[in-house]
Regions:
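Beta-strand-rich interaction surfaces with strong enrichment in secreted/lumenal proteins
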Residues: 7-8, 77-79
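Residue-level recognition of beta-strand termini and adjacent short loop/turns
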Residues: 11-12, 82-84
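A short, aromatic/hydrophobic, helix- or strand-capping loop or linear motif
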Residues: 50-59, 114, 256
């Protein structure tokens, strides 16, 4: 779905992406969002010293992995370039049909350079740039309040490119440790939405309140790992037999019971290009 990029083109070989950014895209302080913001943000995300656990999301990009590992030091060799203020060119190692899905992940979002540098070095962790009053973002909401273990409040961002269509004035997020407590609060109308439901409540919602339960596809695969260095699982034939014997339908129906889909391949079925 187009957001800060209004459109994009993909080369015939699937290795080059050209993103066209909206001219009216703004940071929450009014600064324009530019292609260079993405270049700098991805440079920061790949800094070895930052220790970004999601750096691998960018590894399909030419030389991104080598840069993150410190094998090369010249970021100009990494396949991301700002052709002008509103045009971003990304070159991949191979055709990666799910690359656009990777860009849905928050680790690929641009960050505001001036704000980060005002509170420390780009690769420094734990600085105050994310605190209320400091944080500058480019989404539909801005951070207003963050009280640890109490509440996070965000308010509508007047500089958002599509602010006219943002219907909510704000959102309150309540951290709740106990999933049963959270479900009761949702049922009582104290919460408008929850992403966590006790397993034993899912069947009840499906039966009595199906309109209040929505199961989204998740780009991930759950699996059980075995020690294949010890007998009998060191025998490939035994592993193949176990694979054939497992009733995946029964596992998701009677064990996990969370709306999972039986996995017959390691790649999730909703992966683009699969």
């Amino acid at each position: 779905v187009p957001a800060v990029a209004k459109s994009w083109q993909i080369s015939e070989d699937g290795k080059t992406y050209i993103f066209h950014l909206r001219e009216n895209a703004r940071w929450s302080n009014g600064d324009p969002v530019t292609a260079q913001d993405f270049v700098w943000s991805w440079w920061r995300a790949l800094q070895p010293a930052l220790g970004n656990q999601y750096a691998y999301m960018l590894f399909p990009i030419v030389n991104a992995e080598a840069y993150a590992r410190g094998d090369i030091r010249d970021f100009a060799k990494v396949g991301v370039k700002a052709q002008d203020d509103h045009t971003l060119k990304v070159e991949l190692n191979h055709s990666t049909p799910y690359f656009l899905q990777l860009l849905d992940h928050y680790s690929t979002y641009p960050v505001h350079r001036d704000t980060i540098e005002a509170f420390g070095a780009p690769d420094e962790r734990g600085t105050r740039w994310t605190r209320p009053g400091n944080y500058v973002g480019n989404g539909p909401f801005v951070l207003d309040t963050w009280r640890l273990n109490d509440i996070i409040q965000v308010r509508r961002n007047p500089h958002y490119w599509d602010a006219a269509n943002v219907r909510l004035s704000g959102i309150d997020f309540h951290p709740i440790e106990n999933v049963s407590t959270e479900e009761r609060m949702f049922r009582a109308g104290q919460l408008h939405i929850t992403g966590t439901i006790p397993i034993d409540k899912i069947a009840e919602y499906r039966r009595k309140k199906p309109d209040r339960l929505l199961v989204h596809p998740y780009l991930g695969t759950y699996y059980y790992r075995f020690n294949v260095r010890k007998a009998p699982l060191d025998d490939q034939r035994v592993r193949q037999a176990l694979n054939l014997a497992l009733d995946r339908e029964a596992i998701v129906r009677h064990v996990t019971k969370g709306g999972e889909v039986p996995a017959y391949t390691f790649t999730p079925p909703d992966t683009m290009g699969y």
